[in-house]
């Protein structure tokens, strides 16, 4: 069923719902409040515990036509994916991609059948306990800018809009990576520019201004999801990412990336924020991205909301990070080593603090095939290291007081159809894409299905099935995880325990281990730490603890006075003697007291 957007401009929500009739039912008065909210620079739950969100994007399949620009063919496949993510990685969050092209196939017309499938598939993840962040996605503006024989493709804006724009024949010139189209393809640049400048187009439905139309479409999506997700499911919705990887397209005379972000992008987000409020999403933050090149380590343009002042709690600082030098294959020789990404992720923490808002890295990763794929194990390890702490492994034990907050993040990507696609690139039957992600030669999916339909990890489980502090009763002071993930057959160990802690050294031995230090707070609820499958769980802590029956969650007691510094060492080593464990605890207690 489809709705005409451009004829519906009511002054109040009740009028809108009356005009739309039964297609968008009234918002339920008893809808559950969000399970995760914003408090300063932290995500928190209803117990006041500091929450870390970790998971994956679902998925790059939305960029493809083969399954209707949805992450999954149906709810059954969504459940297969969600169960695999839970069981193989212990993740708690997904970033769920949305397609403008699929949602508005004709000017002013919303496809509620598509939105119904979105709600159903996202609801599967919510039912299994995942937090869900919806993402209004685009790359290179639209697939319809590209001719059937092009080397590249895009996703995002619908065909009718591109046709009305009358854009020039696309060409990237001498490009070795699809991302170069962003700044070198005149059609992509002009179309992107037109959106931000609200160009008025002549369409079959009359005159339509592009940015206004995007906002109207987005509001209809938000209204539909608010009305059609059950209260329990909606409670698991974190918020909205209004626009993936924003860029100006072209700058006006006298304009640069910083002024564009200040004068164009930020006002757009403020308008989107009001739209969320009017669509029943006032208690969810907008997860806003700065200009996409603000933190590039090769192509860099000033940004990161340098001129907005504090933006929390109604906004979250949402960014991506890809190691452009490592992906290039020529600007970084060899593999990543300890601390390669630490400064880049420290910069994200610094912007979070300056903006008084939490930070989340909603895309990161490295190609799993191709001529730089040999770097993936080390680069991805370095990125997770950067999420866990701002310090290198060599620095951590000696400078632990400056470890910084643990960052939330969703890796790109989780596509159960990896390597099993049948995508007609740019609708060309002679260019059927089957391998990898089936999109612009990318191959990032951490998961795939075998011939029996069972999901398996395409990366080392030690890297992806991680220890992380999912809910800390109080304030996290420091965290680190030595995953000892492998590059081929060789374990990468970047976190040596110092010789000044000999009993901790003996307890850890050559095993994987994590250390969490926190200052107590909250309402007495336990601190919850996610554990890898099959972990031996040798624990040295100053608080009582329990481990869940499935072995996947460590609960550290939240009882006692607030403001007390606590510690927990969690290792995969064979348990030492009681005396040795006590000696390790004494060392840790002295170390933590000296540091904090």
What are these regions, as identified by a protein language model?
Residues 33, 38-39, 43-44, 50-53, ...:
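Active-site mouth of glycoside hydrolases
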Residues 53-54, 547-550, 556:
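Short capping micro-motif at the N-terminus of alpha-helices
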Residues 36, 542-552:
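Extracellular/luminal ectodomains and secreted, surface-exposed scaffolds of diverse proteins
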Residues 2-28:
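Secretory targeting and sorting signals
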Residues 306-311, 318, 371-543, 556-596:
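Aromatic-rich peripheral "rim/lid" segments of glycoside hydrolase catalytic domains that contact
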Residues 35, 74, 202-405:
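Extracellular glycoside hydrolase catalytic/binding regions
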Residues 22-28, 218, 287, 408, ...:
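Signal peptide processing junction and immediate N-terminal pro/mature segment
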Residues 132, 359, 409:
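Hydrophobic anchor at the start of a short beta-strand
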């Amino acid at each position: 069923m489809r709705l005409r957007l451009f004829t519906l401009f009511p002054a109040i929500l009740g009028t809108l719902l009356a005009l739309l009739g039964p297609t968008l039912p009234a918002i339920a008065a008893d809808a559950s409040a969000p399970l995760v909210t914003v408090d300063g620079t932290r995500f928190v739950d209803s117990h006041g515990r500091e929450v870390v969100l970790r998971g994956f994007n679902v998925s790059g399949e939305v960029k493809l036509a083969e399954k209707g620009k949805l992450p999954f063919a149906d709810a059954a496949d969504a459940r297969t994916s969600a169960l695999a993510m839970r069981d193989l990685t212990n993740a708690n969050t997904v970033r769920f991609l949305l397609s403008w092209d699929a949602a508005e196939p004709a000017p002013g017309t919303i496809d509620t059948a598509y939105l119904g499938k979105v709600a159903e598939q996202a609801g599967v993840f919510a039912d299994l306990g995942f937090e869900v962040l919806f993402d209004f996605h685009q790359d290179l503006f639209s697939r319809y800018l590209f001719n059937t024989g092009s080397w590249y493709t895009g996703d995002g804006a619908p065909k009718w809009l591109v046709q009305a724009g009358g854009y020039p024949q696309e060409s990237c010139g001498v490009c070795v990576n699809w991302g170069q189209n962003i700044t070198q393809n005149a059609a992509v640049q002009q179309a992107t520019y037109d959106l931000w400048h609200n160009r008025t187009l002549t369409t079959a439905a009359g005159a339509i201004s592009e940015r206004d139309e995007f906002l109207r479409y987005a509001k209809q999506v938000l209204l539909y999801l608010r009305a059609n997700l059950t209260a329990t499911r909606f409670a698991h919705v974190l918020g909205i990412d209004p626009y993936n990887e924003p860029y100006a397209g072209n700058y006006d005379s006298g304009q640069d990336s910083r002024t564009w972000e200040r004068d164009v992008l930020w006002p757009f987000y403020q308008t989107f924020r009001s739209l969320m409020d009017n669509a029943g999403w006032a208690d969810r933050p907008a997860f806003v991205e700065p200009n996409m090149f603000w933190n590039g380590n090769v192509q860099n343009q000033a940004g990161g909301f340098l001129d907005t002042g504090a933006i929390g709690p109604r906004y979250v600082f949402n960014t991506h990070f890809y190691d452009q030098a490592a992906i290039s294959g020529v600007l970084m020789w060899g593999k990543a080593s300890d601390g390669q990404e630490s400064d880049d992720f420290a910069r994200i923490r610094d912007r979070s603090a300056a903006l008084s808002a939490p930070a989340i890295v909603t895309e990161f990763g490295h190609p799993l095939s191709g001529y730089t794929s040999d770097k993936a194990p080390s680069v991805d390890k370095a990125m997770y290291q950067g999420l866990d702490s701002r310090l290198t492994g060599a620095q951590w034990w000696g400078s632990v007081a400056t470890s910084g907050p643990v960052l939330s993040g969703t890796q790109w990507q989780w596509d159960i159809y990896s390597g099993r696609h049948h995508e007609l690139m740019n609708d060309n039957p002679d260019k059927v894409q089957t391998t990898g992600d089936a999109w612009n030669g990318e191959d990032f999916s951490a998961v795939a299905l075998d011939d029996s339909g069972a999901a398996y990890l395409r990366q080392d489980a030690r890297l992806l099935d991680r220890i992380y502090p999912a809910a800390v009763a109080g304030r996290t002071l420091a965290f680190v995880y030595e995953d000892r993930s492998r590059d081929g057959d060789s374990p990468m160990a970047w976190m040596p325990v110092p010789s000044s802690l000999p009993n901790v050294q003996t307890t850890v031995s050559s095993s994987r281990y994590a250390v969490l230090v926190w200052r107590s707070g909250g309402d007495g609820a336990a601190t919850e730490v996610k554990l890898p499958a099959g972990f031996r769980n040798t624990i040295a802590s100053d608080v009582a603890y329990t481990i869940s029956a499935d072995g996947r969650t460590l609960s550290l007691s939240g009882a006692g006075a607030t403001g007390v510094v606590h510690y927990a060492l969690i290792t995969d080593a064979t348990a030492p003697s009681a005396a040795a464990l006590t000696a390790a605890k004494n060392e840790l207690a002295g170390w933590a007291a000296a540091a904090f």
